[in-house]
């Protein structure tokens, strides 16, 4: 996060924004605004903000606002290694659960939305998203497919929306960010309907994120429904490049050399796929022995590295 002092001539506008935020919060009520609320500022053709009221120890309060000004990026432009991108877009991944894991600000939503767009473009079908809030505008037709977006203001509304749209039998359902056990459980239940359910989830590393989600869906115990439906998880990390603003020379092809953002960062990914119903991975998960996934993650990475080498050899020099 970068902090900056506002110019003096912006204080009048900040006062108007503060008053507008107070008015919206009062109109909606404390309970309805508990998880934040949307506002457009300035009201005429302004920017979409997500605001949350935070009480202070002295009895006053502040509003924390997050601006959503991202434009969708093409899947080929986010810096993901070609073999991993190709595996994610395989037609065989048409049901189950797929998770994009990472720390806050790691690019989970950007990656997921780019993937959803490209999947709709290539494989077609109908995709529904349920987000709180909608961060990237995806609504519309994409050659062979359609994407429709819906916004939910609270976890309770998110749960109901997932159940509601699950009955519509989409090809893909993107639940956005899973922030509580009940939403994780609803994701696992929705996956039984036979379509692909995607979401993002906070996690410091791949195995930790998978285990935490599995236990969240089972309210402390490993969810059998999640284990049966699990298809893939991708851990995403954005690493700072060197102080000169240039991407570091890294031999790992799963760390992109494409610098992005300010300050410049590069994309690092680690993944795990589980396609077969009888895959031993599921046995380790059911037992709660998630540490055993390490060897399979390494094996799959070796396979992707081999594919990367073959793809490089096939390129014209």
Task: Label the model's feature ranges.
Residues 1-317:
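Short, flexible helix-loop junctions that flank or precede catalytic/ligand sites
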């Amino acid at each position: 996060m970068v902090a900056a002092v506002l110019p003096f001539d912006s204080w009048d506008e900040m006062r108007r924004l503060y008053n507008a935020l107070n008015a919206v919060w009062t109109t909606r009520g404390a309970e309805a605004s508990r998880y934040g609320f949307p506002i457009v500022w300035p009201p005429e053709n302004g920017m979409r903000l997500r605001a949350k009221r935070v009480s202070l120890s002295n009895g006053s309060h502040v509003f924390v606002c997050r601006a959503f000004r991202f434009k969708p990026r093409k899947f080929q432009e986010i810096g993901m290694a070609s073999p991993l991108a190709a595996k994610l877009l395989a037609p065989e991944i048409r049901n189950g659960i797929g998770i994009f894991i990472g720390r806050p600000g790691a690019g989970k939503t950007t990656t997921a939305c780019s993937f959803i767009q490209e999947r709709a473009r290539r494989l077609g079908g109908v995709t529904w998203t349920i987000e709180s809030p909608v961060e990237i505008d995806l609504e519309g037709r994409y050659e062979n497919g359609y994407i429709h977006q819906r916004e939910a203001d609270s976890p309770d509304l998110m749960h109901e929306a997932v159940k509601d749209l699950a009955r519509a039998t989409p090809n893909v359902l993107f639940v956005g960010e899973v922030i509580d056990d009940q939403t994780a459980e609803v994701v696992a239940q929705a996956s039984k309907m036979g379509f692909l359910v995607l979401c993002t989830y906070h996690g410091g590393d791949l195995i930790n994120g998978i285990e935490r989600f599995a236990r969240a869906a089972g309210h402390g115990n490993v969810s059998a429904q999640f284990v049966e439906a699990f298809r893939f998880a991708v851990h995403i990390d954005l690493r700072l490049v060197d102080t000169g603003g240039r991407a570091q020379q890294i031999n790992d092809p799963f760390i992109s050399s494409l610098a992005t953002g300010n300050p410049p960062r590069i994309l690092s990914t680690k993944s795990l796929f589980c396609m077969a119903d009888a895959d031993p991975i599921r046995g380790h998960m059911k037992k709660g022995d998630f540490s055993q996934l390490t060897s399979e993650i390494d094996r799959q990475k070796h396979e992707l590295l081999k594919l990367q080498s073959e793809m490089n050899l096939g390129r014209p020099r």
